Each structure stands twice: as structure tokens, then as C-alpha cells.
Design a protein with these regions (language model features):
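Membrane-embedded alpha-helical bundles that constitute the cytochrome b-like, heme-associated redox core
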Residues: 1-198
């Protein structure tokens, strides 16, 4: 490695790789479960192409999904621990929105954007885990399931509302991941990406 070439610490690269693998497996296996009974349109509704699913059928998708659920919880725990340890650098603050809107300092605006992304990602991961647990063990986590009974006001069962909310975390997390990668590219280009990959 060239002395001038910056590399992120091994744990940072490993954590990013771990995050990506867990998300891809959870998303693909979740879409396989979705295909067994689509949220929109029931059994005759639109399905996701097999290319983007994992498991081959409902039971296979469930095996992958529930198998990685523990890793997802571990991931969330590590995320919380890291953010608490470095909360001043990573968690969004009340001034960050104002910085995005008013600051002419590009570096400060990018830092504020990163803080917002990290914080929103933490909220989304927690939300995905909570809605997943509410569907996995509805009797044990009845109080979580009950939070989604508001869907009945719009003619939907709380179970359907829960499924829609859980499914929505996939594109939301994917969007934040893309935003994080794009912002990192704008900050350091290929050099910064390479320092994370190898």
C-alpha cells in the first residue's frame, strides 16, 4: 500500500460490509416472503422478479429472513453503541437542518447531511426490527401490533398496515444507503470509496 493512500480501519470496513450483507439478505428474503402473498392485490397482485428474491419459496425465504434477524438486531446494537460513543460527531443535532438550509460552508453542510443520514438510518433499522417482531410474534408483542391499528380507519386491517410499514423500510433504507454513498463520493471520489473497499 502506498504511504499516501488512506485506508479506513479494518473494523470500519468490516462493519460497512456487514451492514451491506445483512441488508441485502434481509431485503431479498423479505421480498421472497412478500411474493407468497403480495401486500398490494393479494395472491393475484404484482410480485417481485425472482432475481431480487432469496429462498426460492415462502419457507426458504422465511428461513433466511429469520436466520438473519438476529444479525440484524446485533447490527442495530452495534450501530447504537457506535453512535452513542461518537454522538457529537454522528447524531443529528438541532442545528443541522439550519446548516443545510443556510450555511455557505460546503464542508459543514456535508457533515450535517451525514449526521441526518446516520440518525435516520438508526430510526429506520429500529422501526424495521420492531415491525418485524410484531409480525413474527404477534401474541408476545401485541402492544407493538396494536400501534398499527390506525389502519382500520382507512379500511385496512392492522396486520395489513403492519406489512406495508415493514415493507416500506426496504426502499427507505436503500435510499439512505445510496444517499450516503453518493455524498461520500462527492466528498472524496474514488479515493474515498477505495479506502473503504480495500
Amino acid at each position: 500500500v502506498s504511504p499516501s493512500r488512506h485506508r479506513h480501519p479494518l473494523w470500519t470496513r468490516a462493519f460497512h460490509g456487514f451492514n451491506l450483507v445483512v441488508f441485502l439478505v434481509m431485503a431479498a428474503s423479505g421480498l421472497q416472503i412478500y411474493n407468497a402473498h403480495p401486500v398490494f392485490g393479494g395472491r393475484g397482485g404484482a410480485t417481485v422478479p425472482e432475481l431480487f428474491t432469496l429462498g426460492g419459496w415462502l419457507a426458504g425465504g422465511r428461513d433466511w429472513h429469520f436466520g438473519f434477524m438476529g444479525l440484524c438486531a446485533l447490527n442495530l446494537g452495534l450501530w447504537i453503541a457506535l453512535l452513542i460513543q461518537r454522538r457529537r460527531d454522528r447524531l443529528a443535532q438541532s442545528s443541522d437542518l439550519a446548516t443545510l438550509n443556510a450555511s455557505s460552508n460546503l464542508a459543514r453542510r456535508r457533515l450535517a447531511a451525514h449526521r441526518l443520514i446516520y440518525t435516520l438510518m438508526l430510526v429506520l433499522l429500529a422501526f424495521a426490527l420492531m415491525t418485524g417482531l410484531a409480525m413474527y410474534k404477534p401474541a408476545q408483542f401485541w402492544w407493538l401490533s396494536g400501534l398499527f391499528s390506525f389502519g382500520e380507519l382507512f379500511g385496512a386491517t392492522s396486520w395489513h398496515t403492519l406489512r406495508v410499514a415493514h415493507l416500506a423500510t426496504i426502499p427507505a433504507i436503500a435510499f439512505l444507503t445510496l444517499a450516503h454513498a453518493t455524498l461520500s463520493w462527492r466528498v472524496g471520489g474514488w479515493r474515498l470509496w477505495r479506502s473503504m473497499l480495500a
